[in-house]
């Protein structure tokens, strides 16, 4: 069958001219222009628009419009792709085309602005006409802004002028003064309102930047205490802060008073005026004025904090300066009414003759113990001096002793004075230390005419009795031999009023506590100080008092010098000293900071001898060198080994006679012997100059003995080295040794000692100290 016939396309309808809309009624207003129109509509014209061209095919009134064909999806997609491709391609515009587009855009903006202006102008004109019809010519609604600030232009009329009935005259005009004041008030109010708005609501983002404004650094931790200048809201508008007064810090009428230059200028002008007015007495008065100004200026420097204590005069020293001075020299004092230390020999208060001897001997600057102890001893105070070895303690007690004796009558004035014993006694633990003190004391006593005698073991009693036949102001002795002399009636202490105990802790360690108590009990009680506050009064203790028998004497003065403070030493101090002043240099029991301490863990005699030979052969240390051992029989064995290595050596121990001891020390001091092998006998108080090395072949049995062993080097401010051979038998002192090495700034703790089990905690159980030197001090003449 044939298919259905193809449908023919419908004929196109004939378009007719559009029918004009009916005219609006007369009473209706014209509709507003559409918002999207870019230009106002053209004015109406009488002519009709031209009719469109007729189409070819026209349909009748009864025919139907054909239905619109639907759009093809493929066609829409194709058009969309073409539009996207055209938009993606860059389109080149020439300069003329770009200028044309810019001009068209600018013309549209100008036209739009003009249209808005004309529209707003019409409304403003209407509001002005309505204002004239209102009573008093004021309309409250007309002054309220009706649009954003951007729509207001200079063409808009100004707001109505306010009228004040109270200030107007009969003609209805406002007073000129009132208007000016009102304007100023309004300006200030507006400015303050703007500042308040800026403070609480924030400044405008476009105008808040200032190059001079301080910015807070997020990485800077320093707090800023200053306000920014822009944060002062009253600086420009409040008359109180409009002009700030800058403070002046110098000159007349200023914050800090007179400057030195201004004060000097005023004083000189005043002095010149006095000279011009009075030719006769004006010059004298002018000099007095200038002298007063100079004194005032010197007095003003008393409170200056920028000067060091060494640059100030003694009368200008303040409490802060003395505190800094004590910290510089590591001086600590305890006790009531303790005087300040002396800064130099000139401020010591010593007599000029004694000061000349001090400079002649070669004492340049006083040591810390001398700075603190001499002023206290000069006030007749009892004293306990705790200082490290080699700190100058000998001169610290000798110089005040000589001043004390110089005020007493000469001992050879009468025969009975010779028989009553010495004025002062100095106790030392060993013979060598006593003889060393005697040598140092004779440097001062021989020029002053005083007699010094040493009483030590090793010499016959007859020889020492012969030395005492003419009397002596000062006796230097060991405790044991002095007790022998007292018991055999060779010596009495009837007029002894000055007692010095040097190395008191060493005397207790050697078992001399009982002899020391016997000596102190043999002193007369008539010149003993009272145990009251009067013992701290320097004026009362320096005066003579009646001692009975028709004689006047001074109070007894007792001084004790030590490196450590064991319990036995404290017990003696509490019994025989009255309200003592305690001076501590550094810390009690610490080694000298100038000594480098080295510790080596070496077990066995042979290994230690080999290590000692390597040290001596290295050439690192120059003689003299001291080697300490614990057992007397090891001294000779080690000395022989040292001689085989090519070094000269001598020994010093308790089995040696006094002549052998003196000869050994003399050979080391004069440089003829390189190495001194000794026991603890030489560990206390013996001063061998320029010792570069101390070797502890055997570790000391106590940390106190170790402290005094290594104190033989690094004396008088010089540096030295101490090497210690340590073994498992020294477990009792390992903890204390480790603590001492930790405190030393120039020493290092070896890993073997740090990790050793015995060095982790202090031993709690007591151990018996073996005194290998006991046989040397026992028996007749042993002391």
Swiss-Prot record:
It catalyses: ATP + H2O = ADP + phosphate + H(+). It is found in: Cytoplasm; Nucleus. A motif (Q motif) lies at residues 343-371. It comes from the Eukaryota. Gene3D superfamilies: P-loop containing nucleotide triphosphate hydrolases. Residues 167-182 have a biased composition (Low complexity). A motif (DEAD box) lies at residues 502-505. Its EC number is 3.6.4.13. Signal peptide: none annotated. SMART domains: DEXDc, HELICc. Residues 594-757 form the Helicase C-terminal domain. This is Pre-mRNA-splicing ATP-dependent RNA helicase prp28. It comes from Aspergillus terreus (strain NIH 2624 / FGSC A1156). The gene is prp28.
């Amino acid at each position: 069958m044939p298919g259905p016939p193809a449908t023919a396309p419908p004929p196109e309808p004939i378009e007719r001219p559009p029918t004009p809309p009916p005219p609006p009624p007369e009473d209706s207003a014209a509709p507003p222009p559409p918002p999207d129109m870019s230009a106002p509509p053209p004015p109406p014209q009488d002519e009709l628009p031209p009719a469109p061209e007729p189409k070819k095919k026209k349909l009748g009134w009864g025919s139907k419009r054909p239905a619109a064909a639907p759009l093809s999806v493929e066609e829409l997609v194709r058009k969309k792709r073409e539009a996207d491709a055209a938009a993606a391609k860059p389109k080149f515009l020439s300069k003329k085309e770009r200028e044309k587009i810019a001009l068209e855009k600018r013309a549209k903006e100008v036209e739009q602005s003009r249209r808005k202006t004309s529209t707003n102008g019409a409304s403003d004109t209407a509001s002005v006409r309505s204002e004239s019809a209102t009573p008093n010519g004021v309309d409250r609604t007309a002054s309220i802004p009706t649009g954003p600030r951007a729509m207001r232009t200079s063409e808009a009329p100004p707001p109505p002028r306010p009228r004040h009935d109270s200030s107007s005259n009969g003609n209805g005009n406002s007073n000129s003064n009132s208007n000016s004041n009102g304007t100023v008030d309004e300006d200030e109010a507006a400015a303050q309102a703007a500042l308040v708005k800026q403070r609480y609501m924030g400044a405008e983002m476009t105008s808040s930047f200032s190059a001079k404004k301080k910015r807070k650094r997020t990485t800077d931790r320093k707090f800023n205490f200053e306000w920014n200048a822009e944060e002062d809201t009253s600086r420009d508008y409040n008359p109180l802060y409009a002009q700030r007064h800058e403070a002046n810090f110098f000159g007349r009428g200023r914050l800090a008073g007179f400057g030195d230059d201004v004060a000097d200028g005023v004083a000189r002008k005043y002095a010149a005026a006095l000279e011009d007015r009075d030719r006769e007495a004006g010059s004298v008065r002018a000099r007095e004025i200038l002298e007063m100004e100079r004194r005032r200026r010197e007095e003003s420097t008393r409170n200056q904090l920028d000067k060091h204590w060494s640059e100030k005069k003694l009368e200008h020293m303040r409490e802060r300066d003395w505190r800094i001075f004590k910290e510089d020299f590591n001086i600590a004092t305890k006790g009531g009414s303790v005087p300040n230390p002396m800064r130099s020999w000139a401020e010591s208060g010593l007599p000029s003759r004694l000061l000349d001897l001090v400079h002649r001997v070669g004492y340049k600057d006083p040591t810390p113990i001398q700075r603190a102890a001499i002023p206290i001893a000069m006030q007749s105070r009892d004293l306990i001096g705790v200082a490290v070895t080699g700190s100058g303690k000998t001169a610290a007690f000798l110089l005040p002793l000589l001043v004390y004796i110089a005020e007493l009558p000469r001992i050879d004035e009468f025969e009975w004075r010779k028989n009553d014993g010495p004025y002062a006694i100095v106790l030392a633990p060993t013979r060598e230390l006593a003889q060393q003190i005697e040598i140092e004391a004779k440097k001062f006593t021989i020029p002053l005419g005083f007699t010094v005698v040493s009483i030590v073991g090793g010499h016959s009693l007859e020889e020492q009795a012969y030395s005492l036949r003419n009397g002596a102001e000062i006796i230097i002795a060991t405790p044991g031999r002095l007790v022998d002399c007292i018991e055999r009636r060779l010596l009495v202490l009837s007029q002894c009023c000055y007692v010095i105990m040097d190395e008191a802790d060493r005397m207790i360690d050697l078992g001399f506590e009982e002899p020391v108590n016997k000596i102190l009990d043999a002193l007369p009680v008539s010149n003993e100080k009272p145990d009251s506050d009067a013992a701290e009064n320097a004026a009362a203790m320096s005066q003579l008092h009646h001692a009975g028998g028709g004689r006047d004497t001074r109070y007894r003065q007792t001084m004790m010098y030590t490196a450590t403070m064991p319990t036995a030493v404290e017990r003696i101090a509490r019994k025989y000293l009255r309200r003592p002043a305690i001076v501590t240099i550094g810390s009690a029991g610490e080694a000298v900071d100038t000594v480098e301490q080295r510790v080596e863990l070496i077990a066995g005699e042979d290994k230690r001898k080999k290590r000692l030979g390597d040290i001596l052969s290295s050439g690192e240390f120059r003689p003299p060198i001291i080697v300490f051992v614990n057992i007397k029989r090891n001294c000779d064995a080690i000395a022989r080994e040292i001689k085989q290595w090519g070094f000269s050596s001598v020994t010093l121990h308790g089995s040696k006679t006094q002549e052998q001891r003196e000869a050994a020390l003399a050979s080391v001091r004069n440089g003829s012997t390189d190495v001194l092998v000794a026991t603890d006998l030489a560990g206390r108080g013996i001063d061998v100059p320029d010792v570069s090395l101390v070797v502890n072949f055997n570790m000391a049995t106590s940390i106190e003995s170790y402290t005094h062993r290594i104190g033989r080097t690094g004396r008088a401010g010089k540096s030295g080295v101490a090497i210690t051979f340590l073994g498992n038998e020294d477990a009792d002192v390992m903890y204390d040794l480790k603590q001492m090495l930790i405190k030393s700034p120039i020493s290092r703790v070896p890993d073997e000692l740090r990790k050793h089990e015995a060095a982790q905690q202090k031993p709690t159980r007591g151990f018996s100290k073996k005194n290998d030197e006991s046989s040397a001090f026992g028996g007749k003449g042993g002391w």
